[in-house]
Amino acid sequence: MKKYTTALWFLVCFMMLQMFIPFGIEQVWNATTGNSDETIEKLIIENSVPTIVVIILFFAMRWTPFTRAYMQSRPWGVFFWIVIAALGTIIPSAWLQEQLPALPNVLEQEFNDILTNRWGYIAVGILAPIGEEMVFRGAILRILLTANTQQPAPDSRQPSPIIPIAISAAIFALIHLNPAQMPHAFLVGMLLGWIYWRTGSILPTILFHWVNNSTAYVVYNLLPQSQDMKLIDLFGSERAVILSVVFSLLILLPAIYQLHLRMRRV
């Protein structure tokens, strides 16, 4: 029970920082500039500063342990297939999203505004992958997996990690506070949880997260209209959409298999 309380404490700390720091920034911004309008610069600062504080806090308190052991194992093959897998999830995820009932995209405009600014990449492409992986995989999932292994299992078998991974993925999806992002965030959270469980390191998950967010940034800036388009609008026909999904799966599934072969704890 103590470990579950610890995991809950990590989540509460993350949420409190994400809530109160932006509020404080807004008050200071409005008082110093005399302008209460929501600007892109203010949005970027409100998204970046809490994440920086999260990174510093979780590192300083050792809530997310860091060692050199994983990098010393020279996991270059794992990193390569992580990048391939991350790229392979993009189109299938978009296709699956289109098959689901339309969900409210309450943060769409704010997210798009951040993506239009070069400094927004620091918030979305660099800080978010590091901060979120430190919290959701390096802290919360780590504690849940530890608690899970301490539970008695029938026939002395190793307890399955699926429940801790699913719990952390669900929390990861809900914390985005945007229903339209939750299905993708949950599925990616499951994959990231599996990667963390197999490696015991957040470096591969940070890399995956970075590729995912960086791709969103690049696509939006190359094709700003893509946010309002479906895959059929991009590829021109239903047949081309299906072929793109199949091609992506032919990238994703072998990448996952290679990761299964290569990933190990050190």
Per-region residue spans from a language model:
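C-terminal membrane module of polytopic membrane proteins
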Residues: W210-V266
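Hydrophobic residues within alpha-helical transmembrane segments
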Residues: C13, L127, I167-I171, L207, ...
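N-terminal membrane topogenic signal
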Residues: M1-C13, A240-I242
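Structural signal for the C-terminal ends of transmembrane alpha-helices
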Residues: L57-F66, I195-T199, L253-M263
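Alpha-helical transmembrane segments in multi-pass membrane proteins
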Residues: V12-R62, F80-W81, L243-S244
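Functionally important transmembrane alpha-helices
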Residues: M15, M19-Q27, Q181-F235
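Membrane-interface helix/loop boundary segments of multi-pass membrane proteins
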Residues: G131-I167, W194-S201
